[in-house]
Amino acid sequence: MENLHNRILEEGQALSSDVLKVDSFLNHQVDADLMYEMGTYFKNYFKDHNITKIFTIESSGIAPTVMTAMQMNLPMVILKKQGSKILKGDVYQTTVHSFTKGTDYELTLQKKYINEDDNILIIDDFLANGEAALGAARLVEGAGAKVAGIGIVIEKSFQPGPKLLEEKGYDVYSLARIEKLEKGIIKIKK
């Protein structure tokens, strides 16, 4: 996705060999036109996967997921990371380790938003170690539903997540694949 690649190279900041800051268009300030284009790419790739719902993890995956759900005319479900008095009782939960924050959290899904007939597309902003995507997949599969695919905005190809998801047999489609990060240097796989 050329527009995304350009934005990463022009506005992204490699803060270290494993941290890429893209808050000017993805996860603090959001470029709605770019999100819409991402939705188009995800829709075109996953259109024949018989998707019934699209899941994302709060919060940075929400914008591209909304645009994808709108274009595919499908319901979207936000998996919760934060505890809530409202989310009690009939829920699926799994523990996930956050690469970015270096902490664990309980990923939560209300049971009423998934059934065994669902084919779920999971969309997330980054793929690094694969923990978030695997946590979402555990919730989906724990409910007896199927992970039909995983859409990633930015994949860090040099980290273990992409290989891990591939080894588990998931169909992963990444809009941008980062080959290498060094302080001040970003190299994108073409």
UniProtKB/Swiss-Prot annotation:
Xanthine binds at L20, N27, K156. InterPro entries: PRibTrfase_dom (IPR000836), PRTase-like (IPR029057), Pur/Pyrimidine_PRTase (IPR050118), Xanthine_PRibTrfase (IPR010079). Pfam families: Pribosyltran. Coiled coil: none annotated. It comes from the Bacteria. It catalyses: XMP + diphosphate = xanthine + 5-phospho-alpha-D-ribose 1-diphosphate. GO terms for biological process: purine ribonucleoside salvage; xanthine metabolic process; XMP salvage. Keywords: Cytoplasm, Glycosyltransferase, Purine salvage, Transferase. Gene3D superfamilies: 3.40.50.2020. Pathway: Purine metabolism; XMP biosynthesis via salvage pathway; XMP from xanthine: step 1/1. It is an enzyme of class 2 (transferase). One of its GO terms (cellular component) is cytoplasm. It is found in: Cytoplasm. Its main location: cytoplasm. HAMAP family: XPRTase. Belongs to the purine/pyrimidine phosphoribosyltransferase family. Xpt subfamily. Converts the preformed base xanthine, a product of nucleic acid breakdown, to xanthosine 5'-monophosphate (XMP), so it can be reused for RNA or DNA synthesis. Homodimer. This is Xanthine phosphoribosyltransferase.
